[in-house]
């Protein structure tokens, strides 16, 4: 399985039109996804940002006809947004903890977050998260987090996490303290767009919302 992502910024005053056009192309888009074995496709929004996530068979290459269809669908939307990611190129994977991926999504909830890196801080962000991977070592995360990945493009960070609700528990005092220390340090290198740490900072940000999903 190959994980793929994309990111865009909706043009000022165009969010209603973006949603409308997404609805107009949706039946054709679903057929396109199914023909090309694209799974777990979702589109997320916070403020004027859009983040998309999906999964494909590894090393899949679209046929000429399907590439033409992809471009045709994109053209019908593109007046409403500017690309953050580069079409046809993967976003940079900054962190992953895929763990045990749940094939059945009925008992998972999503956490999708967005931040803006401060100038020159992309490598420091990557270094800190590489440290988490090194600390984890060969341990496979059983849950509740699963299929967790963080991506970057254009100075933005986008996180995608599938959380098994049957395994969630109240955090211990040690876990709370680690989170506070980690998120406080992260504020040195990035600013939040979504509301994930409003409880810590006292600020008020947008929640990420799912605009669309297709299994």
Segments predicted by a language model, with ranges:
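Short amphipathic alpha-helical segments
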Residues: 14-37, 121-145
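Tyrosine-centered aromatic motifs in long, intrinsically disordered, low-complexity repeat arrays
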Residues: 6, 18, 44, 53, ...
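An amphipathic, aromatic/His-enriched active-site/gating alpha helix that lines ligand/cofactor pockets
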Residues: 32-39, 56-90, 143, 163-207
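Surface-exposed beta-loop interaction hotspot
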Residues: 92-116
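Tryptophan-centric aromatic hotspots in well-structured domains and transmembrane helices
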Residues: 26, 73, 133, 148, ...
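Short glycine-/aliphatic-rich beta-strand segments at the starts of folded cytosolic domains
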Residues: 2-17, 108-123
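Short, glycine- and small/hydrophobic-rich beta-strand elements in well-ordered beta-sheets
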Residues: 30-51, 55-59, 137-166
